[in-house]
């Protein structure tokens, strides 16, 4: 089976230095407290960012989303967006990285005085971790495409846990991924509470029919940066794109389909 996140292994990753709260640690010594909110509860937000030719792609959009998500869960990040950007660039510079790099920026609510969910039990500033890795997607994934299947696990409504949030709690997507893998497919095509196609477990879904592009309304999927860029490119080039509800039956009559993501870029669906 393939995956939208298949990558070429790189020996240099064994020696990377990871940023944790302003300090750098070798990969094999980088760690956080067992009382950290992210570890105990999945309480936090994150973003995946790419470094290409020494430039962080769409960094302003990534940091805006991160901050918007943090505000939505009442998490106040003590570093400004500019300070976070500088920290990421510093991390890539210390690692002498220039391109083909994927960066995971993680912000948890911080350390707890005891393992309990109430944010009032947090006794530290938010934990900020920056993990940079040399990561090039597998070429065969782009050539062969990936296979999708619908699953029983759905994207929940906003009043359960807002599916637009890019939170550390990814169990909903993990369960969908497990279902898809157990069925011998590469990734899950997830529905919303109304039975419409919403998104995939780790990428965003688009299909093409009669030279028109379709994607979901965005109500039940993470606010994808690459997804929005594809939408913008379509509009700029006068390609008709519909953000609307649609069913599996609509997908099955599509001329072609693809998925998008920061790491995945654009991958065809078989």
Residue spans for each PLM region:
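Conserved alpha/beta cores of soluble small-molecule-handling proteins
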Residues: 1-189, 193-194, 222, 227, ...
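Glycine- and Gly-Pro-enriched alpha-helical subdomains that act as flexible
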Residues: 189, 196-218, 223
């Amino acid at each position: 089976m393939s995956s939208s996140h298949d990558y070429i292994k790189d020996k240099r990753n064994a020696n990377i230095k990871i940023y944790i709260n302003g300090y750098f640690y070798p990969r094999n010594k980088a760690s956080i407290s067992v009382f950290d909110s992210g570890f105990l509860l999945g309480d936090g937000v994150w973003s995946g960012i790419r470094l290409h030719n020494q430039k962080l792609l769409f960094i302003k959009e990534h940091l805006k989303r991160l901050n918007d998500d943090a505000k939505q869960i009442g998490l106040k990040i003590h570093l400004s967006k500019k300070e976070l950007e500088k920290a990421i660039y510093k991390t890539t510079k210390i690692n002498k990285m220039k391109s083909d790099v994927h960066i995971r920026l993680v912000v948890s609510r911080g350390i707890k005085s005891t393992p309990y969910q109430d944010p009032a039990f947090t006794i530290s500033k938010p934990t900020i971790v920056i993990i940079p890795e040399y990561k090039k997607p597998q070429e065969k994934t782009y050539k062969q495409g990936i296979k999708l299947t619908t699953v029983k696990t759905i994207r929940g409504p906003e009043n359960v846990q807002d599916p637009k949030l890019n939170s550390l709690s990814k169990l909903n997507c993990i369960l969908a991924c497990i279902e898809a893998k157990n069925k011998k497919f590469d990734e899950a095509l997830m529905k919303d509470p109304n039975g419409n196609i919403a998104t995939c477990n780790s990428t965003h879904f688009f299909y093409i029919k009669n030279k028109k592009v379709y994607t979901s309304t965005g109500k039940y999927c993470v606010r994808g940066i690459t997804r929005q860029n594809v939408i913008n490119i379509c509009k700029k080039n006068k390609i008709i794109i519909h953000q609307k509800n649609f069913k599996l039956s609509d997908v099955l009559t599509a001329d072609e389909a693809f998925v998008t993501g920061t790491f995945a870029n654009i991958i065809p669906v078989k």
